[in-house]
């Protein structure tokens, strides 16, 4: 009985197949992440953030669902399942919140992108 030999051609095709599958999995994970976040902060430093309950009330009155409302430093972060919900919430909050607040879309970078930006922005000293 003959043993099958692994040739260079088989090894190359196997490696290429694994690379294509790995790239496809990375692409799929990036595409499926649809989460979107709004950040609300005051224009004037030291001014208070809007109350999370009032934000919830305004969004619920317009039928807009959200995942979470979280305070972070001097900013209130509202997380949504999709960018469409986030855009609708921004339109509602622009009308209902008093003047003096900035409502902006916040980028939700993946963990890999966050690590790459940390490495890129960190000062490197060689030599």
UniProtKB/Swiss-Prot annotation:
It is found in: Cell inner membrane. Belongs to the MzrA family. The keyword Iron does not apply. One of its GO terms (cellular component) is plasma membrane. Modulates the activity of the EnvZ/OmpR two-component regulatory system, probably by directly modulating EnvZ enzymatic activity and increasing stability of phosphorylated OmpR. Residues 32-127 are periplasmic. It is a single-pass membrane protein. The keyword Cell cycle does not apply. It comes from Citrobacter rodentium (strain ICC168). The chain crosses the membrane at residues 12-31. Residues 1-11 are cytoplasmic. HAMAP family: Modulator_MzrA (MF_00904). Coiled coil: none annotated. Keywords: Cell inner membrane, Cell membrane, Membrane, Transmembrane, Transmembrane helix. The gene is mzrA. Pfam families: SecD-TM1. Its main location: membrane. This is Modulator protein MzrA. Interacts with EnvZ. GO terms for molecular function: protein kinase binding.
């Amino acid at each position: 009985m003959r043993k099958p030999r692994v040739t260079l051609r088989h090894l190359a095709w196997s490696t290429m197949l694994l690379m294509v599958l790995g790239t496809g999995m990375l692409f799929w994970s990036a595409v499926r992440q649809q989460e979107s976040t709004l950040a609300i902060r005051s224009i004037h430093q030291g001014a208070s953030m809007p109350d999370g309950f009032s934000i919830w009330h305004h969004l619920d009155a317009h039928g807009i669902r959200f995942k979470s409302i979280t305070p972070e430093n001097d900013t209130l972060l509202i997380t949504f399942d999709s960018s469409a919900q986030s855009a609708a919430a921004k339109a509602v909050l622009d009308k209902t919140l008093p003047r003096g607040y900035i409502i902006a879309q916040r980028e939700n970078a993946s963990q890999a992108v966050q690590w790459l930006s940390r490495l890129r922005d960190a000062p490197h000293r060689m030599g």
